[in-house]
């Protein structure tokens, strides 16, 4: 089964006030359940969504109904206090779009994180991150579903970003309203896959199984600041659009030849500027097997993949990087530009200098980390990049949060 986790960084300004519970009787984080409804529309980002489909109608209705199960933190851990007591958990949803004949009836499973921008005694302004998978799509098929260039596989990643306002309306009951941006894509593992994006307001109701009232924390929190050099390696596979998926006689036979391997090596310097974040920059080296490659068919009708010299030559780039730290999790964003690469003729006509990386990593003991990113060129997803690495740290000193 395809395992895709999209990932995505939100950089929000948060102030330095921290919070804790006003009741010593609460000994653990608070379990809660929520029901949530979204109703919105699709962004007209490709021809299929704009109306070039079997119905000759734009896709303009998006409905999602979710059940969420999570924990509201209460400030037992320092990271909970620093982030003003966020909530996290898992969600399940069903999705309905006004073109079921070509899109299907997808459903999704995801993890969520509700970060706090500012908290009052009975309410909070929050940002939301949801990462997971969506299943049961009707995807592109040259014979039965030829117009659907938006979804290339039955399983896709689901990436959702949002902003909301949460309000205590009764004891243990919360009402939340806000808006979401939701993206579905398979990260170029199977093409055509233009992806599809939705914007939708939402409302949700939550029940907490304990008291939720909070008050500011007065305890001062210190943490060691450090500098570090991170070294990581990454890997992904992708499928490129070429004549095969447009030719029914070739697609079924030679589809495996359309899979290309991508390897990355990344090294960067990072400085922890506060307990919640790091910034820095570095060098990215990428080897992309697809560059300049061809699929050739000989006189006997046998196909083979022919790699060019570009497939074995590095793409070297420089980038700026930021990490938002949430306990042992880092939300990563890189923005950079390629400074060296050899081009095939086709690439030179369509070359893209900028690259982006959005993802999440987890820090294990001994400064080892592993994660998954969306690695993009010119804001277009190139691969889902699985990676692991090591952070060499030095010059530690105590700093304010």
Annotate each PLM feature:
Residues 31-35, 86-90, 123-131, 175-177, ...:
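Transmembrane beta-strands of outer-membrane beta-barrel proteins
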Residues 35, 67-71, 109-115, 129-133, ...:
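Residues on the lipid-exposed face of transmembrane beta-strands in outer-membrane beta-barrel proteins
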Residues 37-43, 71-73, 92-98, 131-139, ...:
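Transmembrane beta-strands of outer-membrane beta-barrel pores
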Residues 67, 197-216, 381-401:
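Outer-membrane beta-barrel "beta-signal"
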Residues 76-78, 121-125, 171-175, 211-214, ...:
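Repeated loop/turn-to-beta-strand initiation elements of outer-membrane beta-barrel proteins
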């Amino acid at each position: 089964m395809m395992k895709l986790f999209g990932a995505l960084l939100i950089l929000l300004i948060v102030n330095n006030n921290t919070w804790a519970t006003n009741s010593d009787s609460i000994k653990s984080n608070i379990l809660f359940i929520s029901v949530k409804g979204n109703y919105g529309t699709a962004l007209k980002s490709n021809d299929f969504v704009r109306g070039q489909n079997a119905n000759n109608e734009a896709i303009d209705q998006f409905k999602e109904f979710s059940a969420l199960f999570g924990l509201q933190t209460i400030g037992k851990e320092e990271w909970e206090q620093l982030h003003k007591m966020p909530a996290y958990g898992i969600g399940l949803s069903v999705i309905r779009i006004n073109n079921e004949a070509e899109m299907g009836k997808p459903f999704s499973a995801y993890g969520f994180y509700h970060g706090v921008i500012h908290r009052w005694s009975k309410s909070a302004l929050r940002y939301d991150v949801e990462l997971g998978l969506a299943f049961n799509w009707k995807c592109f098929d040259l014979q039965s579903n030829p117009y659907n260039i938006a979804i290339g596989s039955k399983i896709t990643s689901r990436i959702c970003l949002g902003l909301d306002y949460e309000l205590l309306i009764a004891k243990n009951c919360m009402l939340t309203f806000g808006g979401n941006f939701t993206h579905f894509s398979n990260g170029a593992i199977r093409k055509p896959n233009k992806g599809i994006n939705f914007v939708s307001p939402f409302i949700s109701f939550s029940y907490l199984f304990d008291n939720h009232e909070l008050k500011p924390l007065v305890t001062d929190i210190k943490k060691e600041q450090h500098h570090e050099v991170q070294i990581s390696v990454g890997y992904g596979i992708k499928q490129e659009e070429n004549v095969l998926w447009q030719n029914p006689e070739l697609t079924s036979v030679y589809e495996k030849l359309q899979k290309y391997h991508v390897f990355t090596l990344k090294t960067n310097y990072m400085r922890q500027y506060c307990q919640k974040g790091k910034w820095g920059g570095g060098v990215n080296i990428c080897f992309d097997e697809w560059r300049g490659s061809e699929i050739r068919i000989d006189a006997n009708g046998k196909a083979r993949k022919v790699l060019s010299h570009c497939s074995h030559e590095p793409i070297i780039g420089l980038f700026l990087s930021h990490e938002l730290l949430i306990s042992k999790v880092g939300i990563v964003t890189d923005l950079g530009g390629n400074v060296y690469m050899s081009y095939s003729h086709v690439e030179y006509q369509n070359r893209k200098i900028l690259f982006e990386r959005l993802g999440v990593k987890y820090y294990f003991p001994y400064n080892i980390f592993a994660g998954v990113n969306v690695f993009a060129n010119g804001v277009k997803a190139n691969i889902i990049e699985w990676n692991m690495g090591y952070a060499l740290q030095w010059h530690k000193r105590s700093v304010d949060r």
